[in-house]
Amino acid sequence: MSRFLICSFALVLLYPAGIDMYLVGLPRIAADLNASEAQLHIAFSVYLAGMAAAMLFAGKVADRSGRKPVAIPGAALFIITSVFCSLAETSTLFLAGRFLQGLGAGCCYVVAFAILRDTLDDRRRAKVLSLLNGITCIIPVLAPVLGHLIMLKFPWQSLFWTMAIMGIAVLMLSLFILKETRPAAPAASDKSRENSESLLNRFFLSRVVITTLSVSVILTFVNTSPVLLMEIMGFERGEYATIMALTAGVSMTVSFSTPFALGIFKPRTLMITSQVLFLAAGITLTVSPSHAVSLFGITLICAGFSVGFGVAMSQALGPFSLRAGVASSTLGIAQVCGSSLWIWLAAVVGISAWNMLIGILIACSIVSLLLIMFVAPGRPVTAHEEIHHHA
């Protein structure tokens, strides 16, 4: 079992590493490529677009051909495009490389969640996804620090070579450690089981909405945090970095505590707790009389996301044994596109950073609480749990 956990964690971590590690080198990248920093900030969106594009096909391929045939090319593409970005001499080539890099990371991301669906029962999967969420929270803190240390002695290209090395490690794990987990195709007489795993299932759709809104909350916070903390609250850059590190610490602590909480409380209880924390954060930020109270509201956001997201993802994947890849892709596409659409629309309409965050917090909590209360899970699928045979 440990091999599947190690491989899944490694496959997922390419996604945040590809986002956070290069940011520290952005000024030098812009100077070398004769582009403005503003022009290269689109590299973040381009990378996410590549991930979303990968999710359109990766899940279906993983369900038909297996997890390894998607993970291996995905990791290989991530390696090649990381090297390509390091060799780019124009901003156009750099952005093209970033799109393809996101494509590779997206393939790996989809496979990771499909593997966990294949090999873990509902309760263990919820615990593991909570741990994975905590580990993912470490990357936005550690990646820029690692990037800064690398750039003390090496040029910005070394950041992408470091990503390539990470990709090589994932490729080696996928080739030699990971074993195939895709369940055997059902016999002709059992096709009804495959047909019953519909993406239009009410319970699955409710969890898609909940996880998409939750991701929208956390990404809205990340995107608006410089404005909120430095422009509105007046913190210095160093203080901003410290606050963000502390919020990551809150996320990690809650994420690592959630598996223990699942041994005491029902998953539904933790999901309700998550949304109540979001609602409390929205109210706190609305009526906040001081910066200290506002910072407390921000910690509630991080705690709320960490306590509920892994559980919601586990529940979303629960009904799917034969279509776990497609389900994982659907979740990923909805989360990436839904959160990006909200942030873009809010910016176009001219909603302030403060109101943007408060609005999504309150909307997420109200909609999600209603869905948790009134959309119950169907009959669990368990026949495929614990893979004992591998292709």
Curated annotation (Swiss-Prot):
GO molecular function: transmembrane transporter activity
Keyword Repeat: no
GO cellular component term, pick one: plasma membrane
Subcellular location: Cell inner membrane
CDD domains: MFS_MdfA_MDR_like
Cytoplasmic side: 1-3, 63-68, 114-130, 179-198, 266-268, 314-330, 377-391
Bilayer-crossing regions: 4-24, 42-62, 69-89, 93-113, 131-151, 158-178, 199-221, 245-265, 269-289, 293-313, 331-351, 356-376
Parts of the chain on the Periplasmic side: 25-41, 90-92, 152-157, 222-244, 290-292, 352-355
InterPro entries: MFS, MFS_dom, MFS_Efflux_Transporters, MFS_trans_sf, Multidrug-R_MdtL
Domain of life: Bacteria
Membrane topology (UniProt): Multi-pass membrane protein
Record key words, sorted: Antibiotic resistance, Cell inner membrane, Cell membrane, Membrane, Transmembrane, Transmembrane helix, Transport
Single biological process term from Gene Ontology: response to antibiotic
Signal sequence segment: none
Protein task: Confers resistance to chloramphenicol.
UniProt cross-references to NCBIfam families, sorted A to Z: PRK10473.1
Family named by the database record: Belongs to the major facilitator superfamily. DHA1 family. MdtL (TC 2.A.1.2.22) subfamily.
Entry protein name: Multidrug resistance protein MdtL
Organism: Escherichia coli O157:H7
Lineage: Bacteria, Pseudomonadati, Pseudomonadota, Gammaproteobacteria, Enterobacterales
